[in-house]
Structures are given as C-alpha cells and as structure tokens.
C-alpha cells in the first residue's frame, strides 16, 4: 500500500475528466437552472481521472445530473463547513488552506477569501465558526489551533499545543484534528500520530475554554483509538446534548486499536465509562467475512438514528488497497443508544466515500458503485427502501455535502 494514498484516505473521513469538464460546453444533459440559492453543496474528488476536487452548488435536486458549470476547483479530497450563507472548503490532508464561498441568489457561489491554516504541511484538519468574527481551524502538523475572523478570513490568534501535557507517551506533538463547541468548551480531537496515519493508542481529546482560548485538560479513553477524523471531524451531539466522539483506530492496522464511538454526557467533561459503540471488534451480519476494518464518516439523523460507511477488508484487491477503485464500503443504519446496526441494501462503494446527509425522510449517500453508477443514492426512512441507482448522477466521488 502506498503511504500517500493512506494519508489521503485520512481525509476521507482523513483529483473525471480534464479541466474542460467545467466548461459550459460539456455534456451535462440539463443546464443550470435559476431557481434561487443552491439548496445543496457538494464537495467532489475527481480521482482517478484527475488530481483535483470541486465545490459544486446544486440548485435543483430533482435534476438528474450534477452540472459543473458553476463549480469551483480546489485540491483533492475537499470537505465542507457552513455558517449562514458562507460555505467553507477544508483542505484536509491535501491542502493547508480553508477557502470561503458565499451562496448567491442566482444559485452560484462566489469565492470570498482563504486562509492558510498549517504552515508546516499541506493540511487543514477541521474548522468551525463560532460567530461572525471568530472561527477555529486545526493545524495538525504545526500543532496549533488557528483563530481567525471568518468575515475577513484574517488570522487573529492561535493556541499552541506543542506541549508534552497534551501529547501522548512523552511526545509534545498532539496533532489536533476535529473540533466541536459545546457549552463554551471547545472539544479538540487529538491524532497523536506515531507514524501518520498510525496513531498512539487511545482516544485523546483536549478541552479548551472558548472564552479565554486556554486549554483546560486532556482526557483519554483506551477502549478506542484515534479520536476524530481529518477533514470530516465528525463529532456530534444528540437531543440530550450528549457529545459523541468518533474514533478510527489507525485504520485497523494496529491489532489492539478499535474503531467506533465514545460519549461525553451532557454536563460532564470526562468520557462516559458506561458507553462504547465498538464497530470493529464485532461480527456484522450481511458483511463479507463479518468484519469491518474501520469507519470514518457518520451522520446523526435524530432520535438515536445513525448512518455510517464501514470499510470491509474482504474486498481489497490482490495488489493491495485501492481506495478509489475497490468497492469496499457498506452503508449502515445503526441505533446509537442500543449499539446495534444493519447493512443497508445499497451497492457497495469505494473507500473515499464519506458523504451522508438527510432532508426530511430522505437520507442521501454519495456512492461510486461497480455497476449501478455514481452519485447520490437515497434511503427512504418511511418505506425503509434503498434506491438502486443514483437519484442525482455525478462524476467523481462525493466527499461531503451540505443540504439547506
């Protein structure tokens, strides 16, 4: 396995066609429509056809195909964050920058600035916006949390984490990744890279006072390892304001590191010792060989209803992992509270697939399948049925999506 591909996969949760694909003369069967602001934003990676990505506004999800006419080119494996009508493209493991776009009334996006996050490596781990004048972004290799003004995209401060108090096993490089703000405490997932993307054992999370921007303490739980994911971040809260921390277990390459979800209950600042949703140390019905190697991306739809992609090692090709062409990933529906789950009746997709979101009764999955096409497939929560072809077709792999 090539280390470059493995590191880029960290964006997946860690650039089919030539540049002319974004020209208005392409073969999109439906022209862009003028129906107001885009109601969906897609982040698409174009590998293996090209080493680039696109941020694509979609005005009308009833159109059968995604038009790239108004797309903005970015680096490979892009991810998204939003605030009001601002859309941010996060570089993940391919680009040190965060790019800002504004959603326009005519369905387009206007680029409105950028900021370099990590000044030591082409990486921007995750970001979140607090308000019009304050946002955070993580620089995993520089070991800093960058504070910036999201209106002007200017750096206003930083939190230096290069300290053995926040590292593991004597290291002073905690490698901050995911961010989540709850009750004025900034929760920061720490990669604790040993030899990236292999991490030191345990799920390490740093708590920061969001008023003073001073670290409060570091917590660790050794039941799972590698807290939060480059690009995706993936922490979320439920209706109880309980915080869930995803752990990807060094992709399953370290035997005693496991993948799944841990919890910090509402009003608490330590891991819940009574909760651990271990996704890799179990046997799954409907999965070839019964085992998953890791999970990177999750989507919480409410009332304990959780969706995710699971990587199955049974479908790795003879020449080793090919995260773009091997169809290794199953789509799952799970019960967050009972720690149970089932495989959904979708065709399998590639290892880069990360995009899951929902609108009302429809759950959208970005899939790149062997024989059923590529694009957005839908699970109907009312009828419990899965589409067997994309409701919206696109080129490339959808890495992330926002639905308005």
Q: How should these model regions be labeled?
A:
Residues 57-58, 149, 200-213, 257-269, ...:
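Beta-propeller blade signature
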Residues 173, 177-313:
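Acidic, serine/threonine- and glycine-rich low-complexity intrinsically disordered segments
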Residues 64-74, 108-119, 155-168, 215-223, ...:
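Beta-propeller fold detector
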Residues 291-368:
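Loop/turn-rich, solvent-exposed surfaces of beta-rich toroidal or solenoidal domains
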Residues 54-150:
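Post-signal peptide N-terminal segment of secreted/secretory-pathway proteins
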Residues 1-42:
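Bacterial Sec-dependent N-terminal signal peptides
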Residues 73-84, 119-130, 168-178, 226-235, ...:
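Repeated scaffold domains used in trafficking and secretory/extracellular systems
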Residues 46-50, 93-96, 141-144, 193-197, ...:
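Short glycine/acidic-enriched loop and turn motifs that connect beta-strands
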